[in-house]
Amino acid sequence: FFFFYLAKSLENATNFWPDWDYKTDTYSQSTKIKTSEVKKIEKTFNQTTDSFLKEKYWFLTMKAYFYSENQNNAIAFFNTTSSTIEKGISYYRAFSYVAGINYTQNKIALSNYQYAVVFENCPMLRKEAILNFKPQETKDFNESLKMVKNNEEKAALWALYGYYADPVEAISKIYT
């Protein structure tokens, strides 16, 4: 029940979405989770030995950092702990948080690459990846292409590009 208590404690920050405003800039008005609160959740993650609960506390920690006063802590936490987590929906949702933070920091190429990885590896999050992928400049897309590690990531990146820009070119690049 402690997990539910911690998850519920985040709702003021995570469920902020004024029904009268569809613009995302109102996010800055939402309640931010205090770093001290996130540290309590992280401590629980570190102390948990059950693998199922550990994954749940890991994701809860990521979510709390994402909605916290300092989102950079989410990236640091992900980079130091993600290798211990199975690459399932929790992992890729957390990775999409990292991609979102990179987007807000104007790291467009990195963010787009990360959303392509989510798109490729987690079908349940494909809609989220499509909606958050933002091909803005050709140079950003070319930078994203330089980051791919295999043909699957390359195909995912081109598929997302094709959704927003030139589907014929994207298909030709996927199959060549």
What are these regions (language model features)?
Residues 55-62, 93-101, 153-160:
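"A position-specific structural signal for the A-helix of alpha-solenoid helical repeats
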Residues 42-52, 78-89, 114-124, 141-150, ...:
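Solenoid-like repeat scaffolds
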Residues 33-51, 55-56, 60-61, 66:
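Alpha-solenoid helical-repeat scaffolds
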Residues 89-112, 116-117, 166-171:
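Repeat-solenoid scaffold signature
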Residues 70-71, 100-114, 127, 133-155:
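Alpha-helical linker/edge segments of TPR/alpha-solenoid repeat scaffolds
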Residues 1-33, 118-119, 123, 132, ...:
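N-terminal alpha-helical interaction modules that lie
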Residues 26-41, 66-79, 105-107, 131-137, ...:
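Helix-turn-helix repeat elements of alpha-solenoid scaffolds
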Residues 14-15, 136-140, 169, 176:
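Extended alpha-helical scaffold segments
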